[in-house]
Regions:
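Secretory targeting and sorting signals
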Residues: 1-45, 706-720
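C-terminal region of N-terminal signal peptides and the immediate post-cleavage residues
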Residues: 33-57, 70, 90, 361, ...
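Asparagine-centered strand-capping/turn motif at beta-strand->loop junctions
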Residues: 83-91, 612-619
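Intrinsically disordered, low-complexity Pro/Gly/Ser/Thr-rich segments with frequent PxxP/GP/PP motifs
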Residues: 120-159, 638-666
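Short glycine/proline/serine/threonine-rich loop/turn segments at secondary-structure transition edges
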Residues: 156-167, 666-673
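Active-site beta->alpha N-cap acidic-glycine motif
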Residues: 185-302
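Catalytic grooves of carbohydrate-active enzymes
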Residues: 236-240, 250-253, 257, 342-355, ...
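Membrane-proximal extracellular "stem/stalk" segments
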Residues: 539-542, 546-698
Length: 813
């Protein structure tokens, strides 16, 4: 409603001020109508209706950029600073900014109501502090922001009992169209008032998450150190001064909080401290250069967590809800969660040198249903961090119960307070928004404490990845809370062990109660099917490797990252990452392969077929079986069977050729298939098929062979006949010699002359006869051999010798 300015230096009662303003309106409206010659509707607009319109819109925006101290105690001076901006078309004259304190808000829902409409002019903002505790402006020009700052001693605020008081920062003034003092804009916030220590302070646990998106790929270098490859350089930006993770660390180390850490983040930063590469376009990579930033951040974190409680999430912070709703029906999905949990503690211990707790599971936004709880506890966790807007109170409790409560099966639900946990989720880039968030957080915390005198444990679980400005607002609020008078810090483990309230809800909501907005962001079933396919391919690949850890470790962690909660709302990026992991694994497995063969020709009944295995990996492979199969074993056999196998071992960067013995039964073409197998009978890689053409025994070959045999037979027959003729001539010559001796002739001369006349005809042919050489060498007496000339026909005379035939000698009969 429109309000007139109070008399300077006086603080009249609200009722009196309202009556005075109403009277002025009723008396002045007709006068204004007459003076301005307005129509009846216009005159009504200048009256109460005009005031309602102003209350709905507010022509001047008020921004409270700072409020100090956030939690008041006796003797403090409240300082409120900010800006007022005239968003109207007319200048505002006689403007002044005042503080208004309303009645104490006794319930948390009452605080919600004020926070829901912080700038509505229709609210009851209580009495105006007035007096000199105001900021005045002669004129507010349209579109121009004016700064103000008001300081008021706490004693002037007339605060009563302990509690939460609404504080309205209102600007009043008049315009040319409405020439009376009225409220033109307001901004409401909260003043927590607890000057003395609370009788029963609330034990508050604040989770401080160090979680990021996926940064590392499955790729590593071929060097001994296996240089890692990052998706981009975004992690360096988060670690650099002013970056999100740098702010989370520098702010959190000054607070008493429970560090909740994704081990994948630690592994990624640790990898950045050494040599690393950044993926570029295509298959290119560039060298990373932010080792110093990574080392600084990691060293600071190691110092910050000393003596503090550290909770390790499963590696890469897997999406438990997606797994429960879409992944349990895919073989191996729960095994991935178990592996991510098992490696978490080792990673944290190795990098931070502290022993973390791994028995807490944290579903997205603390939303649970029976399937999520079942999956969350399947890997060993027995405590589930839920949130109050999921595990809602259905009983008759008039206060917020402690966080811990049993939900069956030996599982404890640690229910974070929904209001406190979501206080910093909005856009806090403006200082005014951040200030309002801090004050609302403190107000809700104090109101919670004042609900009952019972000792309670409260958990605050903020969003997983606060922005830098959200982190600063969180840190400011926690600093004020831990320095206040109604709360004490407590570790998460202690909160989980606190005695549950008997009336607190222990029933996990049904699956249908799971928020649809969260369900839309889940990883689909196809994502888990692809992960399972990748795992199957990896299992088939690792068994052949001499050093499987070089491949199993980076791909195992990459598959953990494929299930990360950080993919929510980023379906395209998630799918691209999964595809890249699969493609890189296919590239590696393809480095061990059979070299293609062209058609092979076999000439003869049997031959060997070589098949070459190539290994382009940097490490050796073994436990491989090469099988060569004939598709037509009746025509072509492999080692006397349809197929044969041989074990294969190939060093890194080398090839190995395996030879198979084949035998051909029929001429023609046969298809042969070479295939690698693992020792357990699984196919490895693609088969290589090639044709084998057999040209064993053709008609032409048979004709040639037959002709050769015939020639040998004819040659032997001729030799036989020649020897018979030579023997007959020798007998005749002997008889003639004997007759000559009886007649008194010189037998020696006659005997020598007759053979010399016959020798030219027989000697050369016998010398060239192949049969003559073995007979001479093996059967002639030593003395006779030395007395003969190369052209002499000694075999013919030796055949007639009475001595036994020599070994291997053919003897004519």
């Amino acid at each position: 409603m429109a309000e007139a300015a109070d008399t300077p230096g006086m603080t009249p009662s609200p009722a009196r001020r309202w009556l005075r303003r109403a009277g002025a309106l009723l008396a002045g409206a007709p006068l204004l109508a007459g003076l301005l010659q307005l129509s009846a509707p216009a005159a009504q607009a200048a009256g109460p209706a005009s005031a309602k319109e102003a209350s709905d819109t507010g022509t001047v925006a008020v921004a409270v950029d700072s409020l100090s101290p956030g939690a008041l105690t006796d003797g403090d001076t409240l300082t409120v600073s900010g800006t007022v901006t005239n968003n109207g078309k007319q200048a505002v004259t006689g403007a002044h900014v005042n503080l208004r304190v309303g009645s104490a808000l006794t319930t948390r829902s009452a605080i919600d109501g004020v926070a829901k409409h912080p700038d509505a002019l229709t609210g009851d903002d209580g009495s105006e502090v007035g007096g000199k505790y105001a900021a005045t402006f002669a004129k507010l020009t349209p579109g121009v922001a004016e700064h103000f700052s008001i300081s008021v001693p706490v004693g002037k605020l007339d605060l009563g009992d302990d509690g939460v008081y609404p504080l309205g920062v209102a600007v009043s003034g008049e315009t040319a169209a409405q020439q009376w003092d009225q409220v033109l804009g307001v901004q409401r916030t909260f003043l927590p008032w607890q000057p003395e220590e609370a009788d029963t302070p609330t034990r508050t646990t604040l989770l401080w998450p160090l979680v990021s998106t996926v940064h590392m790929t499955a790729e590593t270098g071929s060097d001994a150190q296996q240089t890692p490859v990052f998706l981009n350089d975004d992690l360096a930006k988060e670690l650099a001064p002013g970056g999100r993770l740098e702010q989370m660390l520098s702010l959190g180390r000054e607070l008493d909080v429970t560090w909740v850490i994704d081990p994948d983040l630690l592994a990624s930063v640790d990898a950045m401290t050494g040599s690393y590469r950044i993926r570029g376009d295509g298959d290119t990579t560039t060298a990373g250069t932010h080792q110093a930033i990574a080392k600084q951040w990691l060293g600071d974190l190691q110092d910050a967590v000393l003596g503090k409680e550290v909770v390790a999430l499963p590696f890469a912070d897997p999406d438990l809800a997606s797994l429960a709703h879409n992944g349990t029906g895919v073989a191996g999905s729960l095994s991935q969660l178990k592996e991510a949990t098992d490696v978490a503690a080792t990673t944290v211990e190795t990098v931070l040198h502290v022993t973390p707790s791994t028995d807490f599971a944290w579903p997205v936004d603390g939303a649970v249903d029976p399937s999520i709880v079942k999956v969350a506890t399947s890997a060993g966790a027995d405590k589930v961090i839920a949130r109050g807007d999921s595990l809602t109170e259905t009983g008759d409790l008039t206060y917020t119960p402690s966080a811990a409560r049993p939900i069956g099966g030996g599982t404890t639900a640690v229910v974070a307070d929904a209001r406190l946990s979501t206080a910093f989720e909005g856009d806090l880039t403006k200082a005014s928004a951040s200030t309002l968030a801090v004050q609302e957080f403190l107000a809700q915390s104090l109101a919670l404490n004042q609900q009952t005198g019972k000792q309670r444990s409260v958990v605050v679980a903020p969003q997983r990845m606060p922005t830098a400005v959200q982190a600063r607002a969180m840190a400011q609020a926690v600093t004020l809370l831990q320095g206040g008078t109604w709360s004490q810090p407590q570790q998460l483990a202690a909160a989980a062990k606190a005695k549950p309230d008997p009336g607190a809800t222990t029933k996990v909501p049904s699956k249908s109660a799971y928020p649809s907005s969260l369900r839309k962001q889940e990883l689909p079933r196809s994502a888990f099917e692809q992960i399972a396919y990748t795992q199957d391919r990896l299992d088939n690949f690792k068994v052949i490797l001499a050093n499987e850890a070089r491949v199993v470790t980076p791909f195992g962690r990459a598959m953990n990252r494929e299930m990360s909660t950080s993919w929510r709302g980023r379906n395209t990026a998630a799918n691209t990452f999964r595809q890249s992991v699969q493609a890189y694994l296919d590239t590696l497995t393809g480095q061990v392969k059979l070299i293609d063969k062209s058609e092979t020709k076999l000439s003869g009944r049997s031959a060997t077929i070589p098949v070459t295995v190539q290994n382009n990996l940097v490490q050796g492979v073994d436990h491989l079986i090469l099988r060569l199969t004939s598709t037509n074993p009746t025509r072509l056999e492999i080692s006397d069977d349809a197929w044969a196998e041989q074990r294969v071992t190939v060093s890194g960067g080398h090839t190995s050729t395996v030879k198979f013995t084949t035998s051909a039964n029929v001429n023609g073409q046969t298809r042969v298939i070479a295939q690698l197998y693992t020792e357990d009978g699984q196919k490895y890689g693609n088969e290589v098929a090639f044709d084998v053409r057999v040209t064993e025994i053709t008609a032409t070959v048979m004709l040639v062979i037959g002709g050769g045999v015939l020639l040998l037979v004819l040659a032997g027959f001729r030799m036989y006949t020649q020897r018979k003729r030579a023997a007959a001539r020798g007998a005749e010559e002997t008889e003639e010699a004997e007759g000559s001796e009886e007649d008194g002739e010189n037998g020696e001369d006659g005997a020598d002359g007759a053979p010399e006349a016959a020798e030219p005809a027989d000697g050369p042919e016998q010398a060239t006869d192949p049969e003559s050489r073995p007979e001479r060498d093996s059967g002639a007496p030593p003395g006779a051999a030395s007395a003969q000339q190369p052209s002499d026909g000694t075999p013919d005379t030796a055949v007639e010798s009475a001595d036994p035939s020599g070994t291997g000698e053919r003897v004519d009969r």
